[in-house]
Amino acid sequence: MMMHQLRSRPTRFVALVALAAGALFLAAGGSEGACPPAGARYVVSGGSALVAVDPPPGQPKNDKGGSAMFGGTVARNMVNLTDKNIPGKFEPEDKEVLLWKADLGSKAYGGPTVAGGRIYVGTNNQRPRNDRDIHRTKDGMVEPLDKGVLMCFDEKTGKFLWQAVHDKLESGRVNDWPEEGVCATPTVEGDRVYYVSNRCTVMCLDANGFADGNQGFQGEKYKEKTDADVVWQYDMMKELNVFPHNMSAGCPLIVGDILFVHTANGVDDGHLNLPSPNAPSFIALDKKTGKLLWKNSLPGKNIMHGQWSNPTYAEIDGVKQVIFPGGDGWVYSFVPETGELIWKFDGNPKDSVYELGGTGTRSDYIGTPVIYDNKIYIGLGQDPEHSTGISHFFCIAPKKDKKGDISGVLEVKTKGADGKDVIGEKPNPNSCVVWHFGGEEARKFALRDFKFGRTMSTACIVDDILYISELAGQIHCMNAKTGEHYWKYDTKASIWGSAYFVDGKVYLATDSGDLFVFKHEKTPAKIDELEGITATELKEARKQIKARQKEVADKYLIAKIELDAPIRSTAHVTNGVLYVMTEKTLYAFKGKK
């Protein structure tokens, strides 16, 4: 396959060691019959009832008081329909626009989450807030100790309030990569802050810190006024034998009294062995106590690499369900109270193959499922170290009368002339696929041989218009109902975050430190860079393609704003303020009066 090279900075949160040559094919099930609750382990306690938290059938609603989780709501749609007068074209240091900025560590991926007058972000300790977290060398030099850190700031002023500081795992980079810090975006409900630490521990903190005394757990390592007050913690490595690959990065989902999270179970440093194939990938905890309610060991031995996606909740066609993307390329739906499997969906072609280093055609998920109009939207991707490659984006609509495998196709095996198995496909009568975008691009003069590349991003859907970005730098604008493709734009830098809609604009940040702002239209123009090309030679064709690309930029690009460092998070707006988190700085921007 022709590989489209990423134009990005070299650092990565899941940096890989040298890989052995060869390929590893991991196939997941694909029978036509209904699936039993494979891998389910029921540890259900009484009194843990779900309350109705149903996303609306169309437009999502946002909490004016503050977005409390990744994606804003349980639907995980990156859309804000409330705030207005959000700056779209500005200079970062313009005092009329810059409300405040706060120093972080040297890496920051988790957040920001804004709730209750506070802002929470995950980072590292490369710019320490406490002298105890440094090392003084014999010659008097000061070096920061490597730690994972969750920081809390005041929403209005950016004043530092407190932080949770986590030691690194003793096992090292295979489970806890150096200097990556806390990668999870926190979830906040009331005065409780939930996240997964770099130590693969689910944390519940008191949002007030120690200002209201020591709540819950009493054994905190640090208890100064700027330290975090731990209410409870659940160590997934100790309790469940989970083996996180390089980093734990789950953003918890809360529905009623239940907290859902990925465990990050994955392969070892050799990338061929799965140390804990029977450990759960998906769990549910009591949000008040941290008690395990249920666990599920899917995908089990079929995990290809790591697992860094997030769960989503929805009631679709009358069925309440929690939806987990798996590290085998399948999406799984479970009964929220028990963990019983409802359905599963394979996003890869049946003849796809996972290969070490990302040269294969089979992928898993880093982006989070989005619920819109009773449908699920998700794209496939891989560790960013694997670069880009052929991928797929799906819209699926599960039905209450369809259980088990709802993939678009089923696997068919035949014998080739050499006697070896040949993998093929046939239509799945139980399919719930509405539309699919991606696969091979065979049109003449195409700049690459696939339509859609691997993505780490979560979709943004508003007015039936969908925005989804790729790791390689492209953002696509499509019809959410039909999958019709309107236009795409190449930012020329890798994208780790997601598109975010607010105030008629779409914000998208890149690894080069740029914040792109696009104009949203309810009826976008269809500008296909390859359609209608009249050239017969490549040189002339490229000129025509560039003209189409310029047409997209002229019509939709509002601004390209340069910030101080790579941005590997999603822009966010709460209470009229635009928050942008680079690797080392949290910015708060306001609209001009």
Where are these predicted regions, by residue range?
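Noncatalytic, solvent-exposed loop/strand surfaces
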Residues: 30-593
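Structural motif marking the loop-to-transmembrane transition
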Residues: 10-11, 186
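Bacterial N-terminal signal peptides
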Residues: 14-27
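N-terminal secretory signal peptides that target proteins for export/translocation
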Residues: 1-10
